[in-house]
Each structure stands twice: as C-alpha cells, then as structure tokens.
Design a protein with these regions (language model features):
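N-terminal nucleotide-binding beta1-loop-alpha1 segment
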Residues: 1-16
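Short, well-formed alpha-helical segments that are part of the catalytic scaffolds
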Residues: 15-38
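Conserved N-terminal catalytic core of the sugar/cofactor nucleotidyltransferase
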Residues: 30-93
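Acidic metal-phosphate-binding loop of nucleotide-sugar-dependent transferases
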Residues: 79, 104-106
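Conserved nucleotide-sugar donor-binding
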Residues: 94, 137-149
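Short aromatic/hydrophobic "clamp" motif used to bind/position activated sugar donors
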Residues: 97-98
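Conserved donor-nucleotide/metal-binding helix-loop-beta segment in metal-dependent transferases, i.e.
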Residues: 108-133
Length: 150
C-alpha cells in the first residue's frame, strides 16, 4: 500500500491560500484529495505543512470536508520542505510513499499505478522519476525508508 503526502503551506510566496482556490466547483485540495481517495493503492493521506498557527485554516477545511480521512502533520520550520517530509516519513508504516505537490490538481490514478508498478519491478531503486518532463511533475513515488539515508 501507499501513503500519500500532500505538501502545502498557506503562506506560499506568490499566491497565498492557493490550495483553497476553486477550479470549477472544487478547490485545488478537493481535486487532489478526491483523486487520491479514488486510488485503491492509497490507504493513508497526510497533509504536510508548516507551523500550526500559520496553517490552521487547512485543519478547519479538512475536518469539515473530509472528517478523519486526512491526517495533518505540522512542522515548525515553514520553509524546510525536506525536513518536513523527512520527519513525517518516520511516522509512516507503508513501504511506499507518494509525494504530491499541493498545487498540482492533475492527479491521475493511472499514472500513480504506473509509478507504483515501476518501483515494485525495480527493488534496487529507492525512487522513480519519469524519464521525461510530463504534466504530472508534481508527483513522485519513493520507498518510505529511503528517507532514513538523507
């Protein structure tokens, strides 16, 4: 199974609170989460964000919209994305983790399945990168324990 991490913070530099903006009738977060929930390989979803006092609005949104389906991970350093993901992976028990950029609403179930199959077929690899630039550039899969080597 796969744990998905959505990486986002409310105070992004160019467009604050962009994850709560709507595309059609859904917010960017809703597009991402609905597609992740529709992928049977994913059994756990985290939002990895900065300090709670800066990002509490996300917690309110997720509790009202998704009840207990999304776990929140707060990390005190707003700008240390690597540290945020590293520390969160210590809590994850699944063998594989999917890292999703919070401003990437183009989540495709078929693409996730292909990434998962690629990493399973290549047991010596810790992560899989697509061979060329694609529209899903905000999505990466890796072995969760690979972060212990960082």
């Amino acid at each position: 199974m796969i744990t998905a991490i959505i990486n986002a913070r409310i105070k992004s530099e160019r467009l604050k609170e962009k994850h709560l903006y709507k595309i059609g009738h859904k917010t960017i977060f809703e597009h991402i989460i609905d597609n992740l929930l529709n992928t049977s390989l994913i059994n756990e979803i985290y939002l990895a964000t900065g300090p709670r006092n800066n990002n509490y609005k996300y917690e309110k949104f997720f509790k009202s919209k998704y009840k207990n389906k999304i776990k929140l991970f707060y990390y005190n350093n707003e700008f240390d994305v690597t540290g945020r993901v590293f520390n969160l992976t210590k809590k994850i028990r699944n063998k594989y983790t999917l890292l999703v950029s919070g401003d990437c609403p183009l989540i495709d179930k078929g693409f996730i399945i292909r990434l998962y199959n690629l990493i399973k077929l290549n047991p010596s690899k810790s992560f899989i990168l697509p061979p060329k630039k694609i529209i899903h550039e905000g999505i990466k899969i890796f072995k969760t324990d690979a972060w212990q080597n960082v």
